[in-house]
Regions:
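A conserved beta-strand/loop capping segment in the N-terminal third of enzymes
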Residues: 46-102
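Conserved Rossmann-like nucleotide-cofactor binding loop
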Residues: 14, 37, 152
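Predominantly flavin-linked oxidoreductase catalytic cores and closely associated redox partners
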Residues: 106-191
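Beta1/beta-strand and adjacent pyrophosphate-binding region of the FAD-binding site
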Residues: 1-14
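Short, well-ordered alpha-helix to beta-strand connector turns
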Residues: 4, 26, 142-143
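Glycine-rich FAD pyrophosphate-binding loop
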Residues: 20-43
Length: 191
């Protein structure tokens, strides 16, 4: 059974970033995700300008940056448009396929161990450590577990149980996302 200082469940931006900084500090980190990277993600393709504070990310962002948003149109209650134009970006458009994979690669380069394509089945917090069982039957131990796999990862589920919070989404809280990529000519993007 392998032991880690920290096990991070979920290798999306939050999990990969946590793994990166922990590994950079010399911690032995397991980064576990049910998906294999690179993988598509249908949400979160916009980064706020605060991403500029992370030098290790923006120094290589040509790998994942698609475009900068310098203009936006917002419509009011009477459908009156308000046009915002700026020389500085409002936000950056990225491809999650490339961005998430880049963050995972940064974490691995700092020494994190990536365990991909296997979901966390359960975990048990003991006096001495955390025992995490993976869906393939493997068991890992760690001093700490971080839940970064979304609102229903195993850590979030445990917190919901402890705090007596609902375990299922209500029908009115559920939405469907459709991801479709359309080729748009440069002449339309620069308007």
């Amino acid at each position: 059974m392998s032991h880690y200082d920290v096990l991070v469940e979920g290798a999306g931006p939050a999990g990969a970033t946590a793994a990166y900084y922990l590994a950079k500090q010399g911690k032995k980190v397991a980064l576990v995700d049910r998906a294999k990277f690179p993988r598509e993600k249908a949400c979160g393709g916009g980064l706020c300008v605060h991403i500029e504070e992370f030098d290790h990310i923006i120094s290589n962002w040509d790998d994942f940056l698609e475009s900068k948003c310098l203009r936006g149109i917002v419509y009011g209650p009477e459908f009156t448009p308000v046009d915002y134009v700026s020389e500085k970006p409002f936000f950056y458009n990225i491809r999650r396929l490339k961005f998430d994979n880049t963050l995972v690669e940064y974490a691995v380069a700092e020494g994190a161990t990536l365990i991909e394509g296997i979901a966390v089945k359960s975990f048990e917090v003991n006096e001495d450590n955390v025992v995490t069982k993976l869906r393939n039957g493997d068991e890992l131990t760690s001093d700490v577990i971080i839940g970064a796999g979304g609102s229903f990862d195993m850590v979030s589920r445990r917190i919901r149980e402890i705090e007596n919070m609902p375990m299922k989404w209500r029908d009115e809280d559920i939405a469907t996302a459709l991801y479709f990529e359309v080729e748009v000519g440069r002449e339309y993007m620069d308007r």
